[in-house]
Every structure is written in C-alpha cells, then in structure tokens.
Amino acid sequence: MLRMKLPPKSTHPSEPPPDAEEPEADARPGAKAPPRRRRDCRPPPPPPTGLPRGPPPPPPSPPRGLEPPVASGPTAGAGMPGGGGHAAALREQERVYEWFGLVLGSAQRLEFLCGLLDLCNPLELRFLGSCLEDLARKDYHYLRDSEAKANGLSDPGSLADFREPAVRSRLIVYLALLGSENREAAGRLHRLLPQVDAVLRSLRATRVEGSRGSVEDEPGGDDEQDAEKDGPGPEGGGCAKLGTGGGLGFRAQEELLLLFTMASLHPAFSFHQRVTLREHLERLRSALRVEPEDAEVEPSNFAGSRAQNDSACGDYIQSNETGLVEQAQIPQDGLTVAPHRAQREAVHIEKIMLKGVQRRRADKYWEYTFKVNWSDLSVTTVTKTHQELQEFLLKLPKEFSSESFDKTILKALNQGSLRREERRHPDLEPILRQLFSTSPQAFLQSHKVRSFFRSISSESQHSFNNLQSSLKTSKILEHLKEDSSEASSQEEDVLQHTIIHKKHAGKSPAGNVATSCALLEGLTMQYAEQNGVVDWRNQGCAAIQHSEHCVSSADQLSAEKRSLSSVNKKKGKPQVEKEKIKKTENRLSSRINGIRLSAPQHAHGSTVKDMNLDVGSGHDTCGETSSESYSSPSSPRHDGRESLESEEEKDRDTDSNSEDSGNPSSARFAGHGSVTQTVSVQPPADTVSLGTENGNLLEAPLTSHKYPHIPFMPTLPCVMHNGAQKSEVVIPSPKSADGKAVGVLVPNPVAISTMMESTNAAPVGILGPAASGESEKHLELLASPLPIPSPFLPHSSAPALQLTLQSLKLQPPQGASENCPVNIPQQAATRLSIGSPNTALIPVHNPGAFPGSPVAATDPITKSASQVVGLNQMVPQIEGNTGTVPQPNNVKVVLPAAGLSAAQPPASYTFPGSPLAASVLPTQNSTVLNTATSAQPASTGISPAQSTVPPAVPTHTPGPAPSPSPALTHSTAQSDSTSYISAVGNTNANSTIVPPQPLGPCGSCGRRCSCGTNGNLQLNSYYYPNPMPGPMYRLPSFFTLPSICNGSYLNQAHQSNGNQLPFFLPQTPYANGLVHDPVMGSQASYGMQQMAGFGRLYPVYPAPNVVANTSGSGPKKNGSVSCYNCGVSGHYAQDCKQSSMEANQQGTYRLRYAPPLPPSNDTLDSAD
C-alpha cells in the first residue's frame, strides 16, 4: 500500500519524488502530461521509464502498460540498467504501481480494483477484508456522521443539480459509505443520481463554448477552479483551465464518471439498476472520448498495446496528481484534431435493413425494427417508434443525406400515421425496406445516424452491453442465420414477430408459425428468462368438420407474452365488453409444453365452451418451461392469418386475460403429473383426432364400425394421468345441452386403446355423442391410480342416494384390444359424487404388471398391460320415497385403477354377493348414503388359485366434515346430525330395497377372513389411504395378514343397530415393527369405534405386530422393541432420552488443509 503511494522514492532514491499535488511540479514531467489525459481504452505510456532519465522524453521503447510481468520481464530487463529476471519483474511491478497511482483516475482505479477482487479466491478476499477493516478503522470516527446520513432513512435534501460541486461531492460520499445490503437507501440514491441525458447536454455545451471562446481565459478558469476546489473526493484542487462557466470542466467530468462507476459497481443496487447505470456510464464514456482534450497523444506510442486493455480498463482520465500539470500543456490547435481522428477511428454503420413494421397497441402509430450491420462485424437490432424515426429524419443535417432520400422517406413515414384504407400505397413495409437498404454512404457513416441507432431510450433497444434476453437471442440467431437468408425471408419475419419486436403494453403480437417449430429452436434460452405462455388459436376449427383444417389451426403459435413492470399494465375494458368476452370465449392457458389447461387448475369439471379440436404436442412448443406458465395468465389468442388491421380485436383478446384467470367456467383438470397432449371431442362432429408427440394426427370418423353409438350414453371424455411411463391423452370435456361438463379421468394403468382399435366388437362407452333426451346432466367417472386429497372432488349436497352396482366384472386382456363398457341408463341424468380419492371401491393391485410396461412415447394409442374396470350398470336411487326427494346434480364415482397380472387366465371374475359398504360423504343437509350390490351367493367367491383380487373394499372418506371428531357416529338418520354409513342388504333387479342381511360369515371384523366359510380368500391387497398425494406406488405385502377376530377388542360391538362396520388392519409403512402401539387398543374390552382415515390430514397407522389375546385383555407387543433414534432396545423413540437425529445435522462445508488421517471422521466426499 505504501509503495503504491510512493513508487519513485523506493525505486530511484536519487530522483526527487514527483509530488503531483504541488503546483511547482508542472514543468518537471515535461511530455508526460499528454498520456495522462487519455480517455479512451488504450494503455498509456509507461510513466516510470521517463522519471529516472530526466525531463526529456524517453527513447522509443515498447510501452508496458498493464502487461503481465512474466511475459514482458525479460524484454524490459534487457533494456534497463542492471537488467535481469528478478529486477525486471520488480521494475514491472513498480511501473504498475505508478500507472495505477499517477495515470488512472478515481473511477478507473475503483473499476480496476473491483476487477482484481473478482480474480481473488475467497480466502484472499477474507484476508483483504481484514486489511481493509484495519485501514478503514482509522477514519471511522471522522466518517461516522456521514455514514449515518448515507444509510439513514432521512431525506438527504435537494441533490438535483449535478452541476454544483457540493451536490456531486455529497453523492460520492453517500455512495462510498453506503452499506452493501441497504437496498432502501440505495433506491433513494438511485433516484438522486443525475440523468445521463442532461449530463450529455452539458458536455455538448462545454464543447461548443470551448470551441468559440479562449481556453486560456483566466477569469472563467479561476471561477471554475474555485468552484471545483469545493468538490469532494481524494483530489484536492481540480483543473481549472478547460471548463467554462456554463459547462463541465475536467474535475466535474471525472466526478461524474466516478459517480456512475461507483453506482454501477455497488452491491447495494439491484441487478437491473446496475445494468442501467453501466449503460449510462458507457454513454458518458463515449461522449468523453471525443472531447477535444485527447488530441495530442501520438498513436504510434501505443501501437503495440492498443488492443490489450480495450475492455478491461476504463477511460484514462487525469488524476489529482496530474490535474495541474496538464493545464499548461494543451495547445490551441488541439481542439480541431480530435473530432476528425475520432470520427475516422469510430465504428460506423455499413448497412441498415428494415426487419418489420408493427402497429403499437398504445396508439395508432407504428414501430420499426431495424437490423444494423456495423463495421466491426457486429449485428444489432433496434426498435424505433414512428415518432422517433420521423423526428430523427427531420433533424438530420443536409450534408448527411440527399434531398430525394429525405423526401421519399418522410413521405412514406407520413403515411404510417394514416389508416390502411387511407394510404396510397398498398403496403408500407416494402417501401421503407427498400429505402433503408439503398441508403447513401454519407447517411450511414454520419455521427448522428450512428448515435441514433446506438442510443438507449425507453422506446428503443440496443444490444451493446445489453443483458435483455430477447436481444441476446436475436443477436445469436442473426449470426447463425446471416449466411442463409435475407431480411425479407419468412424465417426472419417469424423471428421478428416472436423475439425482436418490443412489447410496449405487455402484449404480444402474433407470429404465424405455419411451417414447423424447428425454425424456432434457438428460442429455448429466451423462454427460460421471460414469463410468457404459448397459446393456440382455435377459431379456425370452430365450424369445420374436416380434420385437415384443424391440423393447420393447431400449428399457429403466437409470440411469447413478456411480463413487464406495473407501469405498463394493460388498461381495463368497459364492463360490457368484458361480459361479452366472458360469454363468447373461454380460453385455456398453456401449462407445460403447450398443454391446454385452465388458469385456475382445479380438479372438478365444469362448463366448457371450447368446442374446437386442439392438438398440443409436447415437444413442438420449443422449450416452454413449467415455471413460466405457472405464474402467467392466459395468453391472448392471435390468428396468424389475420392482417395488421385486426390489432383492435387482438387488444380485446389480450385485455381479457385477467378475467379468465378467475373464471370458474373453465374446464379444470388436475393430476399428479404433467399432461402432454390435448384432444377435445365435439359431440355433434364426426371427427376425432388424437395427437402424437411428433405433432401427427390420427383421424378416424366416429360413425364407422369402430365407434358404434350408444343411444343412452352421453359423451364422456377421458383424461390420462401421468402415473406411468406412457404418453398421456387429455380430452377436455365437451359442452352438453345446457353447458354441464362431462369428464372421465382415466389414469395410466387403464388403457384407452379401444378408441382406435376395432378388433373387438364390444361397444366402447368412452366416446360417442349423446342421443338421450335427459342427458343434460351427465355422470362423471373419475379413476385415479392412487388416492388423492379429497377436497379436489365435489361432494353431493342433495338427499341420500343408493347406488346399485350390478355385476362388477374384471376383464383381462383378450386379443389385441381392451374394452371399457360404461353403460349409463337414462335415469342417471345427474352427476353422481360417490366416494373420494380415499374411497377404495375396487382396489385391484397387480404385483407383476403394475404400473405397466413402458412403451413408446410417440404412440398415445398403445395398449398398456393393465386392466379395465367396467361398470355395466350404475343406477342412482333414492332411499325411501323416491318421488319426493330431488336428485343431486353432482355425483361422482372414484375408481382407483389398477391392473391384473398378465399371468392370470382370461376369464371373467365375479365378485361375491356380500353387501358392499360405501363411503361417507358429509353433505350440507347430513344425508345418508346407502350402497348395496346385487344379490349373489356367497360361495361364488374368488379362489386364491384364480386371482388375488378381493371384493370391493369399503373405506371411509371424511371430506370436509363439520364434525371435529374423525370417528363416525352410528345412530339413526332421524336423530343424527352428521353423516354416517348404513350398510344395507341386497337389491333385486327392479331396484327395490330388500331387508338387510347379515354381513357375512365374520360379522365382527367385516373382513372375509379365514374364520368363516370364505377361508380360501387371501387378503393381501388391502391398503390404507396414501397420506402423501402424488404418483407413488406401493407393492402389496409379501405375507397375508392373520385373522384378528378371535379374542381381541375388535369383537366388542357397541353399535346400536347391531351391525358393526368393517375394520381392516392396513399395511404398515415400516416393515420392522417400529410403530408405536395404539393407545385405545391397549385397554381391555374396549369396542374400538371405526374412524375415517384422514389420510390427507395426518397418517393413521395402527401397530403392525398386534397379536390376538385369548384372555381379551388387549393386544400385545410381539418381540422386543427398539428405538430408531439411538438404536437401543427396550423403549420407543418417543421415550428416548437422547437428542433427536435431526438436531445433530451439521453443515457440509469443511476446510481441509491436509489429507485427513485414516481414522478421521471427515465426511467430505472425494470431490472436495
């Protein structure tokens, strides 16, 4: 640190120290002053080489600048007295010190130091932090008050006029003392920073006044010097000779550079603020590079190291040590040399191409997007508004463009403000493209044109040092495509509409991607950075009965919708238009990879008004991620075949996004995973198309022999869950007669390959138009592979129903097709809502084939190895007086789908005729749900040799019950206010209720165990409801559960009606018996009340090792117990005295100074 301050004294003791702060040191350095005035990114000449050799300029030797000491050491040492490798390295180090302390200004020193800090490792940074703390502690008390003001919440006062030195000094002090995490104070200082446009105007005023007046004007210089001496910073008195009274002097320019440099590097500012400040700093540096003060530096002195530090170092402005030295060294003719040289060396424009014209949504004017080719082989894309372009051409000097060019351009631009029917020319875009492509060289190489197409404003874009993802993507794509197409090609037009064009009101123009999505493969990186959704235009298939028209409609992909700030929010439409849009359109947003789902993704079905056939391909949307569409509203619909005059209609489409996000009339389908394809079937139409992963369509008419009509069957769409490794198909619900939605959720184990296969002549009840007169309310069947939380299903709010399940059958695969007959009579003109995700009516689990073998993902029609559970007849009936109680309007049946083993014989199994206890659905009026099966002999049970499929297992579904107790009371319907279950007897064919029959051979537990006549029935497929919803699979237990009916507390029936509900011991989540004993089960002679499984609230797992006790004293523990916390036997984890395992978790970062010893307990992996 000390050597950096006094490098000449330590290196050359015989030479007097060049104290730059003394005014008498002006004449000593001689020719060293011009290099210190450098403001471009070129290394200055080495100042220490001239110091030991006296006042004359040094002989021409290669300048060192910031060259690495290792590379330039031998060369430097050869020409120096006492040269050598070590001495040369020392001298190079001293040259760096002197260059840093004497040549660089404050802004460049800070930027250089921050660049060096980025090259240090963390331990070096901590060491440097300690050194900085020690150095900063010396001035802590002096700067304490200023630091409190900088980080406080009080208003710093009026700091608007940046021309005042006191204002600039206070801003610099506040930025220097601002804490690294004080975002609030940083935002306040960001608002107080000067506007870069005002600074540039002041610089231009300084340049104009300096060219007219005398630079050596003593009165003005003295005033400027007196004003600048009051400024802050480490500098003492600023320079005085070059500034004028109305402009900005050297000291003010350096302070402004320091101000913007500190703000752009300060960690307290946000990323967006720092990027914006960096752009302002670059504009300020560009303006200072063409200042007249850098005219005298010979270009030959820097030929060797011109391109080395072009981007690393900043503008080399004179520091405080050299400010007074340079005042007497500037000649008079230096003011006219610099502009020509800067103009000669500047990068100019080689070609301007008009990419596209788009009407703005905020007003009726147009936007123009230009592709600019620069002389340094860079390509930028700039979007200018109609007003900006017109004002620029009107203010253009005469010498830069021809008169005919101006007249033609302005004539075309004036037509841009007119409507299309009022224009004389049919299209404006070809005219402007031709005019800009044939621009004269004087127009292209002028400074005003270059600054116009390089400027950064609120209405334009710029790609130099611009971190916007759209422009980065545009620049990358232009480099990839510059040898393949012209600006008027279709691919660039698509890229123009999808990427380059800037959205001013948060709305996206339409892009017609009719060829394929392959030409948008480069947009993948853009979608990850912008919030947007992909929408599908559906109006083209509204009234078309042919599927080939729908193929072109499905390929219309609109541009992404960029999420802008709250300033650019959309203006609301009148209420009349909003209501009209609500009634006419109900759009579905994209969720993952172009899949159409509603914005509020609920699980219950409702009215669907979208009757179009839309096919969304999983990989054709070019990289849309799930994080975009989760936080984005529904995107507007844009028809690619529409012209530019339909922007007003697109405005109305876009402004209705916020209403659709909360629209309850959207079709809602939710599953455990993503859905990759969408197929909507329209009942009146005769065409169905199933989309594959590749975007292909498989068409087949519904009127053929493959799809025989079922006269009483309403159209039921199917929804495939992502439960297995197979491509899924989603069919949104079509609209019925009165708008009621019909939906069938079919998980992956249930195959729907019968929709496209015709080898079996059995009727398929999934597809087919409804011909019944009473089909305004349909039955919704929901089959889920695993239990899901019950609030996702609506429950019935009507009086009690009795569901008759006749001849439940399971059919294994036969031949090449599978059948899913769902026959619904005309009496079932309601929505049944029976059961919930916890309800296990027909649990069929397959140890061998579950969840199905993976098939090709591109074929959604491929069969799975699982089975189809068919309901031949489902008749909802009313208990008691059937004519007086209204039917419910929302009834569902939940069937957990599963498959049978492939090794099972192809025979139909019939369930035994024992009554079926159903699930409880708590309703608002506390009704009773009675469920029964058809009467069949009990001896027709399934033998173990045939199948392991048990009969329908009743479990309990609590739902959002008003009662806080999970247990269900068992009283009569007249005296009980909560929902309960009454298991009734069988019903005959005409659905009349017969008296209740006994519950089977084992009436105490309800299980068809080995204590009765059904001893052959093995029970290894009963499961408790899954406490964690999601695509999880559990295999059945390897051992069958023993009977617990003899002598346990389960045989203590205490229900009032004599019928005891079934109780089942589910599979334990732990196989080693580490679950605690039940509390109530330990009490002797206690009749345990059957409780509903609140799987969605908390898991209820009874003890797995409960053994029957003949004395009736309760269950016993089988074997010794152990604690999983400490591993010691004899107690459970809840009684463990040791600390919990979770409390001992430590961090993973370790400092390793040497290899650990062999018995070390270091847990780091080999990578560390």
From Swiss-Prot:
Alphabetized PANTHER family for the sequence: ZINC FINGER CCHC DOMAIN-CONTAINING PROTEIN 2 (PTHR46939:SF1)
The entry's keywords: Metal-binding, Zinc, Zinc-finger
Domain of life: Eukaryota
Ranges of Acidic residues composition bias in the record: 216-227
Gene name of this polypeptide: Zcchc2
Gene Ontology MF terms in the entry: nucleic acid binding; phosphatidylinositol binding; zinc ion binding
Region (Disordered): 1-87, 209-242, 561-693, 932-978
Keyword Kinase: no
Basic and acidic residues biased stretches: 574-588, 636-655
Residue spans, zinc finger CCHC-type: 1121-1138
Gly residues bias (residue ranges): 233-242
Pfam families per the UniProt record, alphabetical: Vts1 (PF25479), zf-CCHC (PF00098)
InterPro entries reported in the protein's UniProt record: PX_dom_sf (IPR036871), ZCCHC2 (IPR042793), Znf_CCHC (IPR001878), Znf_CCHC_sf (IPR036875)
Positions with biased composition (Low complexity): 67-78, 626-635
Protein name, UniProt field: Zinc finger CCHC domain-containing protein 2
Compositionally biased tracts (Pro residues): 43-66, 951-965
Comp. bias regions, Polar residues: 932-949, 966-978
